[in-house]
Amino acid sequence: MKLLMNWALPIALGVMPVAAAAAAVTPAERAAIVASATQAAARELKLDAARLRLMPEQLKRQSDWAFLTAKLQTPAGQRFDYAGTDRHEAAQAGAVSDLCAALLRREGAAWKLVDIAVGPTDVAWEAWATTHKAPA
C-alpha cells in the first residue's frame, strides 16, 4: 500500500512522475515546504499551527513546484485527533483520513500554497496538475 501511495498512484495520476526529472530537495527546502503546508493545513482546520505536525511521506520537487503527501500528527508525533475541528464527527465515522496532500509553488525564496487536501478519503489531487498548470 505504501508503494502505491508513494510512487504508483502519483505517477498514474500525472502528478510529479519519476520520469519528469524531479529535483533533489535540500533540507532547507524540505523544511520550508513542510512549514508552509503545515500552516495551510492548520488554517484549513481552523487550528493554531502549534497543534499540528506534518510527517512527510512523499516530497517531490520539479523546478518551482513541489508536491507533498504527509501524515497529520500531534507535535508529540501521535496520531492527529480531529477533536475541536469541524471534521470531528466525520473523523469519528471514519470519513476523514490522517493524510494531507499539498501542491506548492516557489515564489522567490518562499514556498506558497497552491492547493491542499486535508483528510481526503479519495484522490483529491488528481486534477491539480491540469487545474494549476503544474508539471505532470
Predicted segments, located by residue:
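N-terminal signal peptide c-region/cleavage motif recognized by signal peptidases
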Residues: 16-21
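Mature extracytoplasmic domains of secretory-pathway proteins
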Residues: 53, 57-98, 105-106
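Short, non-transmembrane alpha-helical segments in secretory-pathway proteins
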Residues: 24-51
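Short beta-strand edge/turn micro-motifs at domain boundaries
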Residues: 97-130
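Bacterial N-terminal signal peptides that target proteins for export
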Residues: 1-11
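Short Pro/Gly-enriched beta-strand edge/turn motifs at strand-loop
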Residues: 39-40, 81-88, 129-131
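Structured segments of extracytoplasmic/periplasmic soluble domains
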Residues: 40-44, 74-75, 107-110
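Catalytic core of pol beta-like nucleotidyltransferases
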Residues: 134-135
